[in-house]
Amino acid sequence: MSDKTNDDKTLSVNPKKTLTLKRPGVEQSTVRQNFSHGRTKAVVVETKKRKFSRPDEKPEVEAAAAPKPAAPAAAPQQAPASAPVSASAAQASAPQPAPVKAPATKAPAAPSAPVTKPHVAQQRPVHQRPGGQQAQRPRPADRSGMVLNTLSRSEMDARRRALEEAQIREVEERARAVEEAKRRAEEDARRAKEREESARRQAEEEARLKAEAEARRKAEEEAAKRMPQPEARSERRDDARPAPYGARPQQAGRPQGGRPQPAGRPQQGSPRPAPIIADAAPIAGKPLPQSQLRKPGQSDDDDDRRSGAARRGVAAKPEVRAPKVVKGEDDRRRGKLTLTSNLEEEGRSRSLSAMRRRQEKFKRSQMQETREKISREVTIPETITLQELAQRMAERSVDIIKYLMKQGQMMKPGDVIDADTAQLIAEEFGHTVKRVAESDVEEGIFDVADNESAMVSRPPVVTIMGHVDHGKTSLLDAIRHANVVSGEAGGITQHIGAYQVVQNGQKITFIDTPGHAAFTAMRARGAQATDIAILVVAADDSVMPQTIESINHAKAAGVPIIVAINKIDKPAADPQKVCTALLQHEVFVESMGGEVLDVEVSAKNKINLDKLLDAVLLQAEMLDLKADPDRTAEGVVIEAQLDRGRGSVATVLIQKGTLHPGDILVAGSEWGRVRALVNDRGEHVKEAGPAMPVEILGLQGTPQAGDRFAVVANEAKAREIAEYRQRLARDKAVARQSGARGSLEQMMNQLQVSGTKEFPLVIKGDVQGSIEAIINALDKLGTDEVRARIVHSGAGGITESDVSLAEASNAAIIGFNVRANKQARDSAEQQGIEIRYYNIIYDLIDDVKAAMSGLLSPERRETFLGNAEILEVFNITKVGKVAGCRVTEGKVERGAGVRLIRDNVVIHEGKLKTLKRFKDEVAEVPSGQECGMAFENYDDIRAGDVIEAFRVEHVSRTL
């Protein structure tokens, strides 16, 4: 510090030395410690002097320095250099206030002892370096030293705040310490309580185990008293058993107290016995397994002591192996499976049922009882596996296989055998056989006998039939006071409609059938489900083809006919002509002396409608229609469709019994539970009696129109019948697609059909009956060259799956009274699939017919032009042979087809390459003129040959 003057009293620190402060009132000395083996160590010891204060003086606060882990040995080396600085710092800290009274005590020798006083010297002045030590306790004022600087008011306030914060922290730490001590006391009390509870439970468990062991011991003693022979045998076995392991036999000629060997070394020639768990003997009643012979954590000292005692000649006690404990039913039922208990068990034991069966078998063998053979009635279907047959006979499949092996047949349990073989096996094993067929699942569903005493009158079912546009639906609308015709596309009926009206307090059920030729199947179904047929014939149109067809359907169904001559209000009406025309088809009306009722009506002007209804009621009274309403319902499906909001909806006609919501029914190959019944006016009804048409909701799928339905007992029966019918439908479809094979004629027909062009279609309609009519109409359009192939058809809207199917099969999509959803439209637009919508069957058939006509190969039509005779043949360079000809008949055109005829035999057919007259190309050469001709790719021409010219035209065909 040579660059400072004597008057400069500022604090200066050499950067090469560490700033230290000498602790006032502390003396340092060195003590040498002696250790063993001549080692010594010098230890620095600090001695702190006690400061005494006068009574009139205020005690000064000693700033408690934080304990530092640094070794104090470095203090004497730096003390001389920093002595003035320490003295100056001590005097500078003298004027600070002392708010807390703290008696000065001698500092402990160990610097690492915990200090509970607050750390006052944490707030350092701004001019101090971070490397400097904290402020030391101030010296008295009478001591000499260098005063570096007095503390400012802000520094004094900072120190005061630090002291206050330290006091607050000390109070908080004391509170936390009290809470921690309280928490520890509570935790200790809880643990002590848990230990006591655990000890109590363990004592109870040990007492229970001892009681159970004592009870088992007494039971074994009583059993041993009742069975003396097994005990004697066990005693004999115990006598013949060798000495216990670990007990050394007494050798001859050697005293018992021979020289012992060292305790830590085993005896020569004998293995050291393994320790046995001492606690297991009184509890367990069985010899312990090898995995339990050593207790975990047990030391080997016991083994050494036992081996040492044996070597010293002390008689070792024989180890008693406790009998194995068999867990009873109670132990097996309760308790949980753990890893320890699983490892301690010997393995998987028999079940309780197996033990019970074993005991019963043992008792029967002791009592010399033979088990009687139980004869069962075995139901055998058309095919059955050996395993299933064994289960039905309650026999082992191994016994059946052995029997078949004796018969020379090697079979497995999964092999399928026929009903005859199964019957032979069952009879051989002493059982009776009941043969059933797969179709027996439908037995007892339809045609169940009615209870004659419960029969009541039912409304008649009337079907309105006739030719298209003869006014069938208009007549029914006039009767129902409704307007259905306006809702039908094109004014023609394309569905079967079922309605119920009331006349003179009596109900009449009407079924309206389509009159178009495409709906033949619908008319046939309508005739089958009816009691009376009303044949509607227009007075101005007389008998037409569909009228004749309706007559045939009614006669085939055996139902009476009532002729309704409609449109009598027209000027051209001639009812007498209608009656005369009906005579040709064996329909004899009353006006002509027959028995068939005829009524002249006008649906438009509602003339004689009451007479028609009276005739219906009269005919129904003659038929004496009755039904049993208390039996399960049967009927027929009139129409079915897939409704977007309601699912599968079927219009059915109840023929027998009463249908209720919740009934489980089977309709064709579909089944379901009736969720709702809706009548023809859209009202929900609680039940539907005989001859009542209703819509049913809840079927799993859409049945076919015309299918019969019946109510079954449960879902299992319904599912079984539906699966059987679906299987039959698949088999029929496969047989129809595969085609018949056999005769040569059938094979040739198949080859001919395979060359037929196909027009693939995907048809979606609103109801199943309309789809059926469309398919039948398209089948009639087919010829030997082209036909329509229905890739898929179904009731419901057009979906994405339909578009994907059409894209895969390159088919067009036809929607009849349905539309495609947005996803299907977008998909069809992306893939280029055409979707066409129709609501009139006429338009649909016409468009498909035109499209199929485009697939027909055009007709080749040939027109004769003329003949020419070859007069001379010329060889021209770069051209070839050219024929000089004279046209003898007709004309010859350039580019026309030609035939080369030699000796009345056609030897070439081709086209003209050139046609010249006097070296000029001409379009045609008339008769009588000469010309030059050359053929394409042909040169074998001679003088005298005849050339025939013709024109070929291709004309498109239609179906």
From Swiss-Prot:
InterPro entries: EF-G-like_DII, EFTu-like_2, IF2_assoc_dom_bac, IF2_II, IF2_N, P-loop_NTPase, Small_GTP-bd, T_Tr_GTP-bd_dom. Residues 1-10, 154-225, 232-241, 318-333 have a biased composition (Basic and acidic residues). It is found in: Cytoplasm. GO terms for cellular component: cytosol. Residues 491-495 are annotated as: G2. One of the essential components for the initiation of protein synthesis. Protects formylmethionyl-tRNA from spontaneous hydrolysis and promotes its binding to the 30S ribosomal subunits. Also involved in the hydrolysis of GTP during the formation of the 70S ribosomal complex. Residues 466-473 are annotated as: G1. Belongs to the TRAFAC class translation factor GTPase superfamily. Classic translation factor GTPase family. IF-2 subfamily. The lineage of its organism: Bacteria, Pseudomonadati, Pseudomonadota, Alphaproteobacteria, Hyphomicrobiales. Residues 27-37 have a biased composition (Polar residues). This is Translation initiation factor IF-2. Residues 512-515 are annotated as: G3. GTP binds at residues 466-473, 512-516, 566-569.
